[in-house]
Amino acid sequence: MADFDINILGCGSALPTTRHLATSQIVDLRDKLYMIDCGEGTQVQMRRMRIKFSRLNHIFISHLHGDHCFGLPGLISTLGMLGRNGELVIHGPKEIESYMRPVLDIFCKGLPYEIRFNLIDPTTHSLVMEDRSLSVYSIPLKHRIPCCGYLFAEKAKEAHIIREMTDFYQVPVRMMQEIKRGADFVTPEGEVIPNARLTRPAVAPKRYAYCSDTAFHPSIIPIIEGVDLLYHEATFAECDAARAKETFHSTARQAAEIAYKAQVKRLVIGHYSARYEDMAPLKKEADKIFPGTILGEEGMRLSV
C-alpha cells in the first residue's frame, strides 16, 4: 500500500510528441486515488502503470486548456464500461462543467454512475475538498486563462499506542481512542499518567503542491512554503524566457527560484515544451538554484 505517492502519467505541454504525454498525475494516499488534470492518453498510461480505475473518486482540473482536460470524456466513458456505480467528483473552474455537459450528453448517456461538478474560484486560495485522510486547497496561478494549482495536505495521524505501557497501567479498551487523540489517563487511585508515556508520536503529515500552468508567480510562495514535494511547470529553458513570459509559462530556473524561496524539501519539474528533445539542460538550469531538482518523466512514482 502506498503511503503518499505521486504518479506522473504525463508531463508534456500542449503540442503532442512521441517523447511526452499530455499532463496528468495521480495522487495515491493509502490506496485512495486523486487525479490532477487529464490530458490525452491518461487512461492508457494508467493501464501501463497498473493504476486501479476503481479507486479513483476525485479529479482536479487546473484550467481549460486541452492538454489538461481532453482525456476526460474517454476516461469517464471507460469508467462506465467498467461498471462503476459510485459518484465521481470533478473539481475545477466553472468552465469545466460548461465544457463537459454537452460532451456527456452526446457520448456518455446512460452512465451507471453520477458525475458531480464542484466548481471553484481559481483566483482564490481556498479549501476545495476534504475527507478523513487529507484536505485539498486551490493555489491561484498566473496563466492566460483562469488557472489554479492544488495543495494536498495530509491530515495528522493519531499517535501510536505503546501496548506495554497501556497494559502496565491497565488502561481500559474503551479509552484507547481518547489516548490516541492525546488524552492523559487517570488511574483509579487518581494518579495522572501523561499521554507521552502511553503513546509514540505519529509520522508528521506530508504536503504536496502542484503548480501548472503558470508564469513566474512569487505570490504562491506563502501557500506552498515548506511543502515536502513541489511539482512546478518548467515549460521553457532560460534562453526562451521571453517566450515563457509571452505565453504565461515558467522557465526551469524560475521554477527553481520559487522552490528555493518557498524552502520546499524537493522539487520536480515538468510540462516541457515540444521544442526540446533533451531535457537535461532544463535540469541543469534548475539545479543551479535548487540542487537535486527532479526531472519529471512519464511512469515516475515519487514518495512524498
From Swiss-Prot:
Coiled coil: none annotated. Its cofactor is Zn(2+). GO terms for molecular function: 3'-tRNA processing endoribonuclease activity; zinc ion binding. The active site is at 67 (proton acceptor). It catalyses: Endonucleolytic cleavage of RNA, removing extra 3' nucleotides from tRNA precursor, generating 3' termini of tRNAs. A 3'-hydroxy group is left at the tRNA terminus and a 5'-phosphoryl group is left at the trailer molecule. Zn(2+) 2 binds at residues 67-68, 213, 271. InterPro entries: Metallo-B-lactamas, RibonucZ/Hydroxyglut_hydro, RNase_Z/BN. Its EC number is 3.1.26.11. Binds 2 Zn(2+) ions. Keywords: Endonuclease, Hydrolase, Metal-binding, Nuclease, tRNA processing, Zinc. Zn(2+) 1 binds at residues 63, 65, 143, 213. Belongs to the RNase Z family. Homodimer. Zinc phosphodiesterase, which displays some tRNA 3'-processing endonuclease activity. Probably involved in tRNA maturation, by removing a 3'-trailer from precursor tRNA. This is Ribonuclease Z. The lineage of its organism: Bacteria, Pseudomonadati, Bacteroidota, Bacteroidia, Bacteroidales. The gene is rnz.
